[in-house]
Curated annotation (Swiss-Prot):
The gene is isaB. It comes from Staphylococcus aureus (strain NCTC 8325 / PS 47). Belongs to the IsaB family. Its main location: secreted. GO terms for cellular component: extracellular region. Residues 1-36 form the signal peptide. It comes from the Bacteria. It is found in: Secreted. Keywords: Secreted, Signal. This is Immunodominant staphylococcal antigen B. Induction: Increased expression in vivo during human sepsis. Highly expressed under biofilm conditions after 24 hours of growth.
Length: 175
């Protein structure tokens, strides 16, 4: 019987250890740390070429709303200069003396982005500038969350986006 009791005790200890029954007392108070809010941003590096689909990306649109967009190391911000710089296939206008900020960026769109694509991405906030063209599928369309923030302007020719400018007003297109 002594042998049987030893086996039972050993089995009970082994099973208890295996299952890992432990009681943890939660006496220490938990503290909640505040999370810092992260401002949406968008950074693009390199040639845009046939890869302008980022203009339809919700992260890009949100970064425009929060005035936090950077292309090839140049942050789009209000500047009071007239310096113009060509970088890759983009034209930066109003470039600061240090070359790290510009008021506007222009680039040609070489792939097929349609007016319907930008209308879907920007929704009811996309407006048409009243200009020379009376055609519904041509003209300058723009999105700007508020007058003092970044905006984006699309030159549309027969339902096809051909040029984009991102920056602060006053806006000037090359078309």
């Amino acid at each position: 019987m002594n042998k049987t009791s030893k086996v039972c005790v050993a089995a009970t200890l082994a099973l208890g250890t295996l299952i890992g029954v432990t009681v943890v007392e939660n006496s220490a108070p938990t503290s909640k740390q505040a999370q810092a809010a992260i401002t949406p941003y968008y950074t693009y590096n390199g040639y845009i070429g046939n890869n302008a689909n980022f203009i339809l990306d919700k992260n890009f649109i949100n970064a425009i709303k929060y005035d936090n967009v950077k292309f090839n190391g140049i942050k789009l911000a209000k500047t009071n200069t007239i310096k113009k710089v060509e970088k890759y296939d983009q034209t930066f206008k109003g470039v600061s003396a240090k070359g790290n900020e510009a008021s506007q960026l222009q680039f040609v769109v070489k792939n097929n982005i349609s007016l319907k694509d930008i209308q879907k991405a920007y929704g009811k906030d996309l407006k048409k500038e009243n200009g020379k063209t009376k055609e519904a599928d041509s003209g300058i369309f723009y999105y700007q969350n508020a007058k003092k923030t970044l905006g984006i302007w699309f030159v549309v020719d027969h339902n096809r986006v051909v040029e984009v400018t991102v920056g602060h007003t006053p806006y000037k297109t090359s078309k």
